[in-house]
C-alpha cells in the first residue's frame, strides 16, 4: 500500500485488515441474500467497515450483482446529475437522507424502464465519456 501512492496507507492497512477479519469470520454478513432490503444491507456493511462509505459499498454490490443490486454508487458524476455535487452524506444524517432519496429516485425510474440500476449508471458514465460501450475501461477486469 505504501508504494501504491494511494495515501493514508497506515489507516488503509488497518481498515483492510479489519474488513478481512470481519468478512472471513462471517461472510454471510456481506452477502445480498434477498431480492429486497439491499439499502438496509448496504447500510449495515457501511456500519461494520471503517473507511468505506455508502458509495464505495454500493459500487462493490453493483459490481457483484449488476442485474439486481438496488443500491446506487452516488459518485461525483451521479451527484452532479442530481445537482448535489457538494453533498456530504457519510457523516451527515441529513446528507444521507438526500443520498437515499436520489438513490430511490434512480432505482424507481430504472425499474420503470426495466433497466438494472447499475447498467443504467454505466450507460450514463459511458455517455459522459463519449464512449459507445464500457470496453475502454472494463478490459482491466478480464483475466
Residue ranges and their predicted role:
Residues 1, 79-82, 110:
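Hydrophobic alpha-helix position signal
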Residues 12, 74, 98, 102:
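Hydrophobic (often cysteine-bearing) scaffold residues that line and stabilize catalytic clefts
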Residues 21, 92-143:
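A basic, often C-terminal nucleic-acid-binding module that engages the phosphate backbone, implemented
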